[in-house]
């Protein structure tokens, strides 16, 4: 939906790349747009989802403090080490975030799950 796309762009959640008169979206941008569309079907709007983008940026900023020094080394294997570390940190962040959401949602579940 064009209106939703405009809202997502205006919120800074995705930024198309201009190629002449065309706007191009990366595969990750398209995935983000599809997920936002699904949230929108549940009545969760772009304004609320922008919070998740800010949290993701803050999370990556935290990882950067550990990964960037490794990227900057002159060692030929440093880039691979930094990429592996970043992948590991992203995976741990996903696990922690998912678990914390489940913990926070316990009150809605009647504390049936611990």
Predicted feature locations:
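Arg/Lys-rich, alpha-helical DNA-contact motif
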Residues: 2-114
């Amino acid at each position: 939906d064009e209106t939703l796309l405009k809202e997502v762009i205006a919120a800074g959640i995705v930024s198309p790349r201009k190629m002449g008169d065309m706007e191009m979206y990366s595969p990750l941008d398209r995935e983000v747009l599809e997920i936002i569309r699904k949230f929108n079907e549940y009545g969760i709007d772009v304004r609320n989802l922008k919070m998740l983008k800010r949290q993701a940026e803050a999370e990556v900023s935290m990882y950067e403090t550990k990964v960037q020094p490794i990227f900057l080394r002159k060692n030929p294997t440093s880039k691979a080490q930094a990429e592996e570390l970043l992948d590991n940190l992203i995976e741990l962040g996903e696990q922690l975030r998912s678990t914390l959401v489940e913990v926070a949602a316990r009150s809605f579940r009647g504390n049936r799950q611990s």
